[in-house]
Amino acid sequence: MEQGEFEVLLEVGQAYLLKKDYEKAITKFSEALRINPHDPETYYYLGLAYEGAERYSEAAQTYEKTLKIDQGHGNAEIRLNEVNKKITEGGKSKK
């Protein structure tokens, strides 16, 4: 049952992420990580949600966790570099 619940939480979180409802996405991804705290993709999606919510420090920490679990996660490395630039620039970077 937990694996099924994990997958549902992940899918719902992704749907919120696509709708740019970042706070709800953060909640769902966090719940999924309580079930499976070793999934790099969930950390990556959580990082995207934090980044979308302009919570850059939390996004950076989450991308670092992704890379700690999966050192070859290229997307997390790219996003981490982008978030670190935003932090350095005071979070005022515009796309």
Task: Please state what every model-predicted region is.
Residues 18, 52, 82-89:
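Register position in tetratricopeptide repeats
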